[in-house]
């Protein structure tokens, strides 16, 4: 079956796909407010979204194809300390994939490591007034055959609760500096596809929520999850 996207792009299935087998080793360690994770994947017959030419014409044909194998290595460290009214969460992630394309006429960039940096800040100004400043930066990444350029994002939010924390009103602004862009290049067999655009994630808004389960009673429950729901 072939799906028509536009005059230059088709999509289709592949009846000759074989199942992939994933072998994984993962390690986790937690100490107080510090968390560490590292792992390794070895994937036999990985299914990869590939662009080729359709019947030798100037038309890109996208479908899944089995490659020989792929190896992934990754690690992350997360720190969530508490300093009274200030609660930060810092995260650093490392990942790198090695897709073996032997036997395929595909000229892709060399594999390179990818780093993701995240810093979420929570400020408990008063018991009912909280501010949030979330920042993220991700370096360039080669995922299978798609190279993605770096991007960054900054979000802010302010919340105020009323009526013994039953009512909460919040205002927020996402992607303050308009830096969360979608920019990538996909390498295929005699084809290269690129995209460089902004997804219009920059916005401001307001939220209003009301919790109907703040009172303790044997019928309504204890509201044990309310604090966690407000945090999220």
Give the predicted meaning of each segment:
Residues 1-44, 60-73, 199-202:
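Outer-membrane beta-barrel signature, preferentially recognizing the C-terminal barrel domain
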Residues 1-3, 7-10, 42, 46-55, ...:
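Outer-membrane beta-barrel translocator domains and adjoining extracellular loop/strand segments
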Residues 17, 25-31, 75-83, 94, ...:
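Residues on the lipid-exposed face of transmembrane beta-strands in outer-membrane beta-barrel proteins
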Residues 33-38, 85-90, 127-133, 164-169, ...:
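Repeated loop/turn-to-beta-strand initiation elements of outer-membrane beta-barrel proteins
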Residues 34, 41-45, 84, 95-99, ...:
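Structural signature of outer-membrane beta-barrel domains
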Residues 42, 61, 66-138:
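Gram-negative outer-membrane beta-barrel transporters
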Residues 94-99, 115-162, 174-177, 186, ...:
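C-terminal beta-barrel architecture of Gram-negative outer-membrane proteins
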Residues 162-232:
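C-terminal beta-signal and adjacent terminal beta-strands/loops
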């Amino acid at each position: 079956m072939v799906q028509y996207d536009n005059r230059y792009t088709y999509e289709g299935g592949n009846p000759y796909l074989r199942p992939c087998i994933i072998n994984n080793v993962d390690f986790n360690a937690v100490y107080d407010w510090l968390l560490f994770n590292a792992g390794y994947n070895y994937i036999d017959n990985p299914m990869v979204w590939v662009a080729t030419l359709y019947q030798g014409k100037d038309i890109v044909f996208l479908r899944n194809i089995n490659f020989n194998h792929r190896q992934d290595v990754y690690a992350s460290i997360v720190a969530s300390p508490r300093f009274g009214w200030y609660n930060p969460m810092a995260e650093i992630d490392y990942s790198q994939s090695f897709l073996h394309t032997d036997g395929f006429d595909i000229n892709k960039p060399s594999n390179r490591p990818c780093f993701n940096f995240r810093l979420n800040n929570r400020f408990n100004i008063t018991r009912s007034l909280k501010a949030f400043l979330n920042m993220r930066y991700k370096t360039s990444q080669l995922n299978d055959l798609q190279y993605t350029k770096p991007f960054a994002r900054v979000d802010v939010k302010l919340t105020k609760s009323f009526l013994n924390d039953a009512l909460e009103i919040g205002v927020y602004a996402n992607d303050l500096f308009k830096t969360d862009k979608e920019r990538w290049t996909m390498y295929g067999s005699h084809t290269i596809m690129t995209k460089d655009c902004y997804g219009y994630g920059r916005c401001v808004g307001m939220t209003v929520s009301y919790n109907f389960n703040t009172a303790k009673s044997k019928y309504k429950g204890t509201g044990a999850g309310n604090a966690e729901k407000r945090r999220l």
